[in-house]
């Protein structure tokens, strides 16, 4: 999400197998290929490298299992590059951090769901814009090599590039694609993100050059994010209107069609209120009517430290888990 509030949260929340009940939408066969939630926690905290369990946390496999049981088949798993690679992007791994990340990914894929590996770094490393496409390609060749034999793993080049040279964003995404394929990861999809926080509502104006990306395996997915508050930052539980969800993805939908691409909403959310429920439902229904270009969507976000966060999808009592999941269930 645009506002990096995840870095400041440290309220603990448990997990269980309880599920919410509420006024439901009619269940139907899923029209999306992938539909699920983000799994946040390993990117929390401002201390680098920080202490596991104090500054950051890894997602709870039992909570992931609960969401899989509800029908989710996709989880975007956040991590911080500086914790995985404390010395340099091309350096050695912190083995404990890598092992914990792999445990989460394995929990997802062992449950038959897809895991999207998400370096949640905003196009930056140690606070500086990533400028070396060579180093970025090596980073991705090394990381993809860890998971190249798991067909249920997918790769997200980086979270929410912003305030960067547009050609650099294009070239970093291409370097990531090249590195992933060089690792021998040829079966997995690669999710590319754009500049300006990869917003769907600004995509056409900002990220048109992204259509020039190439992949020898033809498995590029254009990941966009879309929040429904006034500034699109995802910091308010108030949605602009009941129709704002559909409105904010309409132009991007046409861009995907015009350029013969496929897309995915990697982050979206709205408050647990009537206006947002209608706005979220309207966006998803519009996407469901355009599945020739939309592969699916993932809610922001589940994770064990969200506490009473306005968009928490963490079982058993996250605000969105109890207040919004019935809206999403129509698409699971």
Swiss-Prot record:
Relate the protein's function as given in its record: Has endoglucanase activity on substrates containing beta-1,4 glycosidic bonds, like in carboxymethylcellulose (CMC), hydroxyethylcellulose (HEC) and beta-glucan. Involved in the degradation of complex natural cellulosic substrates.
Per its UniProt record, what Gene3D superfamilies does this chain match?
Answer: Glycosidases
Per the similarity annotation, which family is this?
Belongs to the glycosyl hydrolase 5 (cellulase A) family.
Which GO BP terms sit in this record? Answer: cellulose catabolic process
Where does the record place a coiled coil?
none
Pfam short name (any one): Cellulase
Protein name per the record: Probable endo-beta-1,4-glucanase B
Q: What is its main location?
A: secreted
Q: Which UniProt keywords apply?
A: Carbohydrate metabolism, Cellulose degradation, Glycoprotein, Glycosidase, Hydrolase, Polysaccharide degradation, Secreted, Signal
EC annotation from Swiss-Prot or TrEMBL:
3.2.1.4
Q: Report which reactions are catalysed by this protein.
A: Endohydrolysis of (1->4)-beta-D-glucosidic linkages in cellulose, lichenin and cereal beta-D-glucans
């Amino acid at each position: 999400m645009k506002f990096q509030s995840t870095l400041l949260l440290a309220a603990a929340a448990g997990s269980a197998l309880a599920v919410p009940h509420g006024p439901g939408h009619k269940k139907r066969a899923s029209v999306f290929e992938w539909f699920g939630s983000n799994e946040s926690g390993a990117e929390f905290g401002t201390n680098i490298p920080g202490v596991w369990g104090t500054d950051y946390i890894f997602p709870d496999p039992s909570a992931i299992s609960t969401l899989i049981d509800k029908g989710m088949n996709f989880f975007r798993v956040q991590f911080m590059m500086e914790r995985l690679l404390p010395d340099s992007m091309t350096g050695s791994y912190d083995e404990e951090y890598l092992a914990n990340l792999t445990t989460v990914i394995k929990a997802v894929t062992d449950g038959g769901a897809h895991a999207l590996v998400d370096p949640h770094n905003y196009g930056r490393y140690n606070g500086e814009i990533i400028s070396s496409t060579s180093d970025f390609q090596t980073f991705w060749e090394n990381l993809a090599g860890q998971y190249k034999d798991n067909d249920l793993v997918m790769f997200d080049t980086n979270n929410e590039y912003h305030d960067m040279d547009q050609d650099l964003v294009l070239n970093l995404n291409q370097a990531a694609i090249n590195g992933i394929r060089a690792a021998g990861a040829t079966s997995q999809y690669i999710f590319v993100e754009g500049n300006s926080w990869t917003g769907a509502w600004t995509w056409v104006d900002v990220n048109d050059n992204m259509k020039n990306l190439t992949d020898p395996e033809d498995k590029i997915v254009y990941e966009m994010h879309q929040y429904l508050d006034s500034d699109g930052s995802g910091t308010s539980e108030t949605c602009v209107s009941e129709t704002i969800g559909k409105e904010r993805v309409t132009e991007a939908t046409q861009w995907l069609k015009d350029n013969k691409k496929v897309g995915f909403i990697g982050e979206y959310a709205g408050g647990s209120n009537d206006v947002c429920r209608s706005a979220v439902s309207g966006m998803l229904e519009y996407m469901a009517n355009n599945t020739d270009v939309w592969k699916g969507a993932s809610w922001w976000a589940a994770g064990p430290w969200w506490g009473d966060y306005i968009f928490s999808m963490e079982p058993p009592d996250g605000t969105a888990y109890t207040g919004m999941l019935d809206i999403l269930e129509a698409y699971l």
